[in-house]
Amino acid sequence: MTIPSLLLRGLIGLTVLMNLAGCLSPPTLTRAVVSYDNAITDSISKQLLLNIARAHHHQPVHFTGVSNVAATFDFRINAGATPTLTGEAGKTLLPVFGGSVAENPTISIAPIDGEEFTRRLLTPFQETKFTLLLRQGGDIDLLLRLMAKELRVDDQGEDIAYRNSPTDKAGYEMFRKVVLHLSAIQDANRLYAESMLFERTWTIPAESVTAEGFKALEQDYLVAYDPQQKTYRLRKPVSGRILITNYDPNTLPQEERVRLHEEAERSPMNDVSFDIRPGHYGGEWPLKGEFRLRSFNTMLNFLAQSVEEEPEYAVEKDNRTPPFMDNPVKTMDLLVQESSPSESDLTVQSHGKYYSVNITGPLARWNREAFKLLYQLFQMTVTEVSRSGVPSITIAK
């Protein structure tokens, strides 16, 4: 083989190898991103289970987050020539090509703690976050059983509280029955969760408004001039508190919407108000009151206590409640076993036991949705993990 032909073959092979390296880079990057994403998600999920186990043993909860992931990929190619093992010695050279891919990840983890996170962990959720999850298609039965700590009902002017706690038998059963009633209305696609929309109006003398003041008013209000009275009438649309109903609240007169908003406004922001009226689906059992939401820390304690100390039990619906789809005994069925369950894809070991979510049987989907909801609520609680100024551990491979 002549030297020119050898060089030509070498150049062709080198070109092919460089193209091959370029083709390998995107798949390698994709696999790495997906692998890190799965690892971080799995880490958070297991921490949630681990903290339920800690709360089960009345120990403090704690979370650790990944603050930074940096990975460097090194793609290398090399080429050379070597004499062949056969043929006339010294006359034939064999081109040699090679390549390698190296990954050098650096992962920084830091504790999620401090006053700000602790305050968010202990602060009850507001109605806006509850409504956001409900509007994403969340089951109101699951949402309220996990997020609400009590039901408050107006009984002839008296505010009566029913706790979402199995130790309070009368309160727990009333809470479950009302939640089931709302769930039945939702299953029939007759449940509304809307803000009270209305207008506020003001009247001011025209001579009290300067040209600059008029321009400022136009930015925030709808302005109409009354030449006879020489006044300006200001109107401003208001989106008030959220109300769960079995009717369309926009069909109510404005005065009624204002009254409902003002009633809800007297309650704290972690109250979710509801109004079930006769004459509409589910109106056979008229109800009016609020659900008081709890904090993420209280949710973990509720799930932990339901394992052994305060187990939930079956509650049947009220006779006035329409048909519904699901009524699981437990908000989330947690298994505590001596050995690791083979059928579970999410298990942690703590205090000599294996904690897992029951994903077998007819309620497998319910339990998965319950854990997914817990994960989403944690994401709503935690702030961005700090990347500086806190003790951290950096792992370099």
Residue ranges and their predicted role:
Residues 13-16:
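N-terminal export/membrane-targeting signals
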Residues 19-22:
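C-terminal motif of bacterial Sec signal peptides marking the signal peptidase cleavage site
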